[in-house]
Amino acid sequence: MSKLDEDVQKIGDKLVFNPYNTNNKEITTQEIKNILKQYGVPCNIYNDKLYKRAFVHKSYVKKPLLENESENILVVEKPHNCLPLSTKSNERLEFLGDGVLECITKYYLYRTYPKENEGFMTEKKIAIVKNEHIGRIAYEMGLH
């Protein structure tokens, strides 16, 4: 068995898509509220689906049937103890969030360093918003 990419494996002469993971669980609305409260974010949740989607990795999303058939990929049936695959991942929300985070960071740096030039602020912004830094913060917050 050889790994072709994150979610498709070659088993013998067949390609098999098996994204299921018994450790995956859907975040509850109460867990979302607890996280927001813990970090002092005043928020009424009107659409918990957006918050829940923020926790869906692209590897846990349904592959279109035609894509699987055209590539001759066998899709494993969902085990009884696993969440069903999602129709959407967090990718688009991540794109939007990255833009918001960058905007807030730029504003903060602009106000904090009024005498510095844009090159200085750009270097600081890059250091603050890089994935490793944000990943570490998310891990420390328990968002892993």
Residue ranges and their predicted role:
Residues 2-144:
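RNase III-family endoribonuclease catalytic core
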